[in-house]
Design a protein with these regions (language model features):
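Short alpha-helical segments that sit at the start of domains
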Residues: 1-16, 39
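A cross-family signal for key residues in well-ordered alpha-helices
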Residues: 19
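Short capping segments at the starts of secondary-structure elements
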Residues: 23-27
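A short acidic, leucine-rich amphipathic alpha-helix
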Residues: 30-33
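Short amphipathic alpha-helical interaction segments
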Residues: 37-48
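A short, conserved structural fragment
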Residues: 50-60
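Minor-groove-contacting beta-hairpin "wing" of winged helix-turn-helix DNA-binding domains
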Residues: 60-67
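Short, amphipathic alpha-helical interaction segments positioned at domain boundaries
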Residues: 69-73
Length: 73
């Protein structure tokens, strides 16, 4: 399941992951728990969100970019 629609906007699961990241850095496990999504979906979704410029990876954790923050406000 994709996290980014063809129009560049996040899907429902993508939005859940972005909202889970809103509070700060999060590991895939923390994001999965907060978003209520399976870990395998979060891992693949984070790759998509990072490639789309909506999230950044720092070591083993992720954070929202300015672009990602704007999409969920």
């Amino acid at each position: 399941m994709a996290c980014i629609n063809p129009d560049g906007k996040p899907t429902e699961s993508g939005t859940k992951m972005l909202r889970a990241l809103k509070s700060g850095l999060g590991s895939p496990e923390e994001i999965a728990k907060e978003a209520g999504l399976p870990l395998f979906r979060v891992r693949s979704g984070l790759r998509e969100l990072t490639q789309a410029g909506l999230a950044n990876q720092k070591d083993e954790k992720y954070e929202l970019t300015e672009k990602g923050t704007e999409l969920i406000e």
